[in-house]
Amino acid sequence: KEVSIRGQGSLAYPGLRTQGNLETLSGPNDATRGLTSLADTFEHVIEELLDEQQVIQPSKEHKDADLYSTRVMLSSQVPLEPPLLFLLEEYKNYLDAANMSMRVRRHSDPARRGELSVCDSTSEWVTAAEKKTAVDMSGATVTVLEKVPVPKGQLKQYFYETKCSSKGYAKEGCRGIDKRYWNSQCRTTQSF
Protein backbone atom coordinates (compact mmCIF):
# COMPACT_ATOMS: atom_id res chain seq x y z
CA LYS A 1 0.00 0.00 0.00
CA GLU A 2 3.01 2.30 0.04
CA VAL A 3 3.14 4.97 -2.66
CA SER A 4 6.65 5.29 -4.03
CA ILE A 5 6.21 7.92 -6.74
CA ARG A 6 8.55 10.91 -6.48
CA GLY A 7 7.79 14.52 -7.24
CA GLN A 8 5.08 17.05 -6.48
CA GLY A 9 2.27 15.46 -8.48
CA SER A 10 1.28 13.35 -11.41
CA LEU A 11 -0.56 13.90 -14.67
CA ALA A 12 -3.56 11.93 -13.41
CA TYR A 13 -3.90 14.02 -10.23
CA PRO A 14 -2.29 17.44 -10.79
CA GLY A 15 -0.74 18.98 -7.72
CA LEU A 16 -1.40 15.94 -5.52
CA ARG A 17 1.48 15.13 -3.18
CA THR A 18 2.36 11.47 -3.48
CA GLN A 19 4.11 10.82 -0.19
CA GLY A 20 2.92 8.50 2.56
CA ASN A 21 0.54 5.58 2.15
CA LEU A 22 -2.85 5.31 0.46
CA GLU A 23 -4.83 5.91 3.70
CA THR A 24 -3.07 9.24 4.41
CA LEU A 25 -3.58 10.79 0.96
CA SER A 26 -5.99 13.70 0.93
CA GLY A 27 -8.99 13.86 -1.35
CA PRO A 28 -9.18 15.58 -4.75
CA ASN A 29 -10.22 18.90 -3.16
CA ASP A 30 -6.66 19.41 -1.93
CA ALA A 31 -5.31 18.95 -5.46
CA THR A 32 -6.23 22.39 -6.79
CA ARG A 33 -2.77 23.89 -7.18
CA GLY A 34 -2.59 23.14 -10.91
CA LEU A 35 -0.30 21.09 -13.11
CA THR A 36 3.39 21.43 -12.29
CA SER A 37 5.75 21.74 -15.22
CA LEU A 38 7.98 18.86 -16.23
CA ALA A 39 11.07 20.99 -15.59
CA ASP A 40 9.90 21.73 -12.02
CA THR A 41 9.33 18.02 -11.40
CA PHE A 42 12.81 17.13 -12.64
CA GLU A 43 14.26 19.97 -10.59
CA HIS A 44 12.62 18.63 -7.42
CA VAL A 45 13.85 15.09 -8.08
CA ILE A 46 17.40 16.32 -8.69
CA GLU A 47 17.27 18.45 -5.52
CA GLU A 48 16.14 15.40 -3.53
CA LEU A 49 19.01 13.34 -4.91
CA LEU A 50 21.57 16.07 -4.20
CA ASP A 51 20.21 16.73 -0.70
CA GLU A 52 20.71 13.13 0.35
CA GLN A 53 24.08 13.08 2.11
CA GLN A 54 24.13 9.32 2.63
CA VAL A 55 27.28 7.70 1.35
CA ILE A 56 26.63 4.14 0.26
CA GLN A 57 29.31 1.85 1.65
CA PRO A 58 29.56 -1.65 0.18
CA SER A 59 29.09 -4.42 2.73
CA LYS A 60 31.90 -6.84 3.49
CA GLU A 61 30.35 -9.50 1.29
CA HIS A 62 30.03 -7.02 -1.62
CA LYS A 63 33.39 -5.30 -1.34
CA ASP A 64 33.82 -5.28 -5.14
CA ALA A 65 30.65 -3.24 -5.64
CA ASP A 66 32.69 -0.18 -6.63
CA LEU A 67 34.22 -2.02 -9.60
CA TYR A 68 31.13 -1.46 -11.74
CA SER A 69 31.72 -0.40 -15.33
CA THR A 70 29.16 1.15 -17.67
CA ARG A 71 30.78 -0.58 -20.65
CA VAL A 72 30.12 -4.12 -19.36
CA MET A 73 26.75 -5.85 -19.34
CA LEU A 74 25.56 -9.34 -18.42
CA SER A 75 22.69 -10.45 -20.64
CA SER A 76 21.24 -13.49 -22.38
CA GLN A 77 21.13 -11.59 -25.69
CA VAL A 78 23.01 -8.77 -27.41
CA PRO A 79 21.98 -5.38 -25.94
CA LEU A 80 20.00 -3.32 -28.44
CA GLU A 81 21.27 0.10 -27.38
CA PRO A 82 24.54 1.66 -26.26
CA PRO A 83 25.19 1.99 -22.51
CA LEU A 84 23.06 4.46 -20.56
CA LEU A 85 26.06 6.76 -20.04
CA PHE A 86 26.32 7.40 -23.79
CA LEU A 87 22.56 7.93 -24.14
CA LEU A 88 22.60 10.46 -21.28
CA GLU A 89 25.48 12.32 -22.93
CA GLU A 90 23.55 12.52 -26.22
CA TYR A 91 20.47 13.74 -24.33
CA LYS A 92 22.53 16.44 -22.59
CA ASN A 93 23.85 17.61 -25.96
CA TYR A 94 20.26 17.69 -27.26
CA LEU A 95 19.14 19.83 -24.29
CA ASP A 96 22.07 22.20 -24.76
CA ALA A 97 21.14 22.63 -28.43
CA ALA A 98 17.47 23.18 -27.54
CA ASN A 99 18.40 26.17 -25.36
CA MET A 100 20.10 28.05 -28.22
CA SER A 101 18.62 30.39 -30.77
CA MET A 102 18.44 29.08 -34.35
CA ARG A 103 21.34 31.29 -35.47
CA VAL A 104 23.60 30.18 -32.60
CA ARG A 105 22.59 26.52 -33.10
CA ARG A 106 23.36 26.69 -36.83
CA HIS A 107 26.84 28.14 -36.24
CA SER A 108 27.65 25.74 -33.40
CA ASP A 109 26.89 22.65 -35.50
CA PRO A 110 30.18 20.70 -35.81
CA ALA A 111 29.51 19.82 -39.46
CA ARG A 112 28.99 23.49 -40.31
CA ARG A 113 32.23 24.55 -38.59
CA GLY A 114 34.17 21.83 -40.37
CA GLU A 115 34.85 19.86 -37.19
CA LEU A 116 35.53 16.20 -37.84
CA SER A 117 36.99 13.46 -35.73
CA VAL A 118 40.69 12.89 -36.31
CA CYS A 119 40.03 9.17 -36.79
CA ASP A 120 36.83 7.35 -37.75
CA SER A 121 35.64 4.94 -35.09
CA THR A 122 32.96 2.31 -34.60
CA SER A 123 31.31 1.27 -31.35
CA GLU A 124 29.67 -2.10 -30.79
CA TRP A 125 28.90 -4.74 -28.19
CA VAL A 126 31.36 -7.66 -28.28
CA THR A 127 31.30 -10.92 -26.33
CA ALA A 128 34.01 -12.86 -24.57
CA ALA A 129 34.04 -15.23 -27.56
CA GLU A 130 35.60 -12.35 -29.53
CA LYS A 131 37.55 -10.92 -26.59
CA LYS A 132 39.57 -13.30 -24.39
CA THR A 133 41.35 -10.66 -22.28
CA ALA A 134 40.49 -7.17 -21.06
CA VAL A 135 42.12 -4.37 -19.08
CA ASP A 136 40.49 -3.74 -15.70
CA MET A 137 40.17 -0.38 -13.94
CA SER A 138 43.54 -0.89 -12.26
CA GLY A 139 45.25 -1.31 -15.62
CA ALA A 140 45.90 -5.04 -15.19
CA THR A 141 45.16 -7.53 -17.97
CA VAL A 142 42.52 -10.05 -16.90
CA THR A 143 40.97 -13.14 -18.49
CA VAL A 144 37.34 -12.70 -19.49
CA LEU A 145 34.68 -15.31 -18.73
CA GLU A 146 32.52 -16.07 -21.76
CA LYS A 147 29.52 -17.03 -19.62
CA VAL A 148 28.79 -16.04 -16.04
CA PRO A 149 26.84 -18.52 -13.88
CA VAL A 150 23.67 -17.17 -12.24
CA PRO A 151 20.98 -19.03 -10.24
CA LYS A 152 18.75 -19.50 -13.32
CA GLY A 153 21.42 -20.51 -15.83
CA GLN A 154 24.22 -18.57 -17.49
CA LEU A 155 24.52 -15.06 -18.91
CA LYS A 156 26.95 -13.85 -21.54
CA GLN A 157 29.27 -10.99 -20.75
CA TYR A 158 29.12 -8.11 -23.27
CA PHE A 159 31.61 -5.26 -23.63
CA TYR A 160 30.88 -1.95 -25.37
CA GLU A 161 34.01 -1.38 -27.40
CA THR A 162 35.01 1.65 -29.45
CA LYS A 163 37.80 1.07 -31.95
CA CYS A 164 39.26 2.61 -35.08
CA SER A 165 37.23 2.01 -38.19
CA SER A 166 38.91 -0.24 -40.74
CA LYS A 167 37.61 1.87 -43.61
CA GLY A 168 38.10 5.56 -44.21
CA TYR A 169 41.20 7.56 -43.36
CA ALA A 170 42.86 5.00 -41.07
CA LYS A 171 45.17 3.77 -43.83
CA GLU A 172 46.00 7.25 -45.08
CA GLY A 173 46.75 8.73 -41.66
CA CYS A 174 44.81 11.03 -39.39
CA ARG A 175 42.71 13.97 -40.53
CA GLY A 176 44.20 17.40 -40.00
CA ILE A 177 47.82 16.25 -40.22
CA ASP A 178 49.92 17.57 -43.09
CA LYS A 179 50.91 14.34 -44.85
CA ARG A 180 53.76 16.06 -46.68
CA TYR A 181 55.69 16.60 -43.44
CA TRP A 182 54.26 14.21 -40.85
CA ASN A 183 53.38 10.53 -40.64
CA SER A 184 50.32 9.61 -38.59
CA GLN A 185 48.16 6.60 -37.95
CA CYS A 186 44.95 5.86 -36.08
CA ARG A 187 45.27 3.20 -33.39
CA THR A 188 42.82 1.79 -30.88
CA THR A 189 43.96 2.41 -27.29
CA GLN A 190 42.67 1.23 -23.94
CA SER A 191 40.70 3.73 -21.90
CA PHE A 192 38.68 3.34 -18.73
Swiss-Prot record:
Q: Which residues form the propeptide?
A: 1-106
Enumerate the UniProt keywords alphabetically: Cleavage on pair of basic residues, Disulfide bond, Glycoprotein, Growth factor, Secreted
Query: Is Secreted a UniProt keyword of this protein?
Result: yes
- Disulfide bonds, which pairs? C119-C186
GO CC entries: axon; dendrite; extracellular space; synaptic vesicle
Q: What is the annotated localization of this protein?
A: Secreted
SUPFAM superfamilies, sorted: Cystine-knot cytokines (SSF57501)
Under InterPro entries, the record lists: Brain-der_neurotrophic_factor (IPR020430), Cystine-knot_cytokine (IPR029034), Nerve_growth_factor-like (IPR020408), Nerve_growth_factor-rel (IPR002072), Nerve_growth_factor_CS (IPR019846)
A Gene Ontology molecular function term for this protein is: nerve growth factor receptor binding
Gene3D superfamilies per UniProt: Cystine-knot cytokines
- Sugar attachment sites: N99
Q: Which Pfam families match?
A: NGF
GO biological process: what's one of them?
Answer: neuron projection morphogenesis
The record's function comment reads:
Promotes the survival of neuronal populations that are all located either in the central nervous system or directly connected to it.
Family, per entry: Belongs to the NGF-beta family.
Q: What is this protein called?
A: Neurotrophic factor BDNF precursor form
